[in-house]
Amino acid sequence: MGEKSVQKKKFILETARKVFVEKGFKKVTMKDIVEACQISRGGLYLYFDSTSQIFLEVLKLESEEADDVFSGSIREDATSADILILFLQEQKKELLRKENTLTQAIYEYYFEFHPTKKDNILKIQFDSAVKIMEMLIQTGVESGEFYCEDCKGMARNIMFVLEGLKISAQTIGITAETVDREIAYILKSLDA
């Protein structure tokens, strides 16, 4: 794919993201994306076959960008505790963000399509986050920053708490105080 095609595809994905944020997943059609991008229907189908394919590409792009932002925020001399606190603070920002979020669209997509474990990007991201969190906690235990007898169990628990907070943010609403309380509980559990 040439540079012009790469840029066009990225433009479509960035524009489609805005459409998914506004309408969720279920209500978005290829026509909506064509109109938002101001391109021909054929021009869109040159790159994508369906709204599902576009949505999954939007999620991948979003994940890559979030990883880049987080990685760029970590100091060279950061300790395991510093990294964990930075990660939890980034999660807090995301949880409290009221606008420009794909959370509703993500849940609509997964409730509608029930992807298998193999192609479920949320499951893949969750499992990857658990592994990274487990390594981070293990490193913190080895350096004496944390105390934890079951690093994998703690990592899984942290990710389930964050996922529960995401759902709560979309359904019943949460406050900064609620998120701070949960973060404090996580840190206390590690004696951080």
Question: Can you annotate each of these PLM segments?
Answer:
Residues M1-Q7:
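N-terminal intrinsically disordered/low-complexity leader segments
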Residues K8, T51, V58, E62-A66, ...:
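Hydrophobic/aromatic residues within well-ordered alpha-helical segments
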Residues F11, T15, V19-Q53, E57:
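Helix-turn-helix
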Residues E57, L61, S71-K98, M154-I158, ...:
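Hydrophobic alpha-helical connector segments
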Residues E64-D67, T116-E142, R156:
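Amphipathic alpha-helical packing segments from all-alpha helical-bundle domains
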Residues L86, E90-K93, K131-E142, V161, ...:
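C-terminal peripheral helix-coil segments that are non-catalytic and often amphipathic
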Residues L95-K117:
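Amphipathic alpha-helical segments used for helix-helix packing
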